[in-house]
Amino acid sequence: MSSQQTSSALPPVFVALDMNEGAVSPLLGTLDGLNVGYKIGMELFYQSGADLVRRMAQDHAIFLDLKLHDIPNTVQSAAARIADMGVRVTTVHAAGGGAMLAGLPALERDDFQFLAVTVLTSMKAEDLRGLGVSDDNPQNRVQHLFNLARDNGITGFICSPLEVEGLHAELPSGTFITPGVRPAGASLDDQNRVATPLQAKQSGATSLVIGRPITRAPDPRAAAQDRK
């Protein structure tokens, strides 16, 4: 039994596959039958490529997280290739600008959507200062990038659990996927702006991204069902 969705609804959790390809199949077997999707990021994609993405997309809801950020023509071409892989959602950096974002909504379908990345959940005020951002408040930066993406037709967003409530209130019909989710008592690892799964869902998150608290848990199947 696969975890593929029977409609355009996204699964409540995407399990982050930040691992080598050899570790993927055992984990899929452990989580078989659960209503989860899988996030394929740079580590796994650069090891195994588009073939793995296409194979997994036949049976599972896939979130391809490559955070496209380049000149508009390059991003448009890459995005068109991704749209044909069968994935459900994929990411672009909102900081790429309006010209980069504006052409993407035309590539969306009922079962495929772009998500604008605002501020990474690992970033703090000091990190923004290091980038030369004049307003180093992460929430203000998130709001600015949210406005930019929304004004260019993007309705899906990646944001931390701390910002999702306010953004969801501004765009109730939007898609909001939140990384930086840690069950109560779990290690924060390299995340800074975090919340529990229950807090994130109550704040308006459409789906959660959870990696190490599931993949490195003694019982990954039980961890994948922990929504507290």
Spans of model-derived segments:
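Acidic (Asp/Glu)-rich catalytic clusters
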Residues: 4-7, 26-33, 51-59, 80-84, ...
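Alpha-helix N-cap and loop-to-helix initiation/capping positions
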Residues: 23, 130-141, 188-195, 219-223
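Conserved, mostly hydrophobic/aromatic
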Residues: 15, 38, 67, 90, ...
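Metabolite-binding pocket within alpha/beta catalytic cores that recognizes anionic/polar moieties
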Residues: 37-89
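N-terminal basic/disordered segments at the start of proteins
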Residues: 9, 13-21
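Glycine-rich phosphate-binding active-site loops on the catalytic face of alpha/beta enzymes
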Residues: 85-100, 190-223
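Conserved anion-binding
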Residues: 12-13, 70, 74-156, 160-165, ...
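Hydrophobic beta-strand scaffold residues
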Residues: 62-63, 114, 176, 208
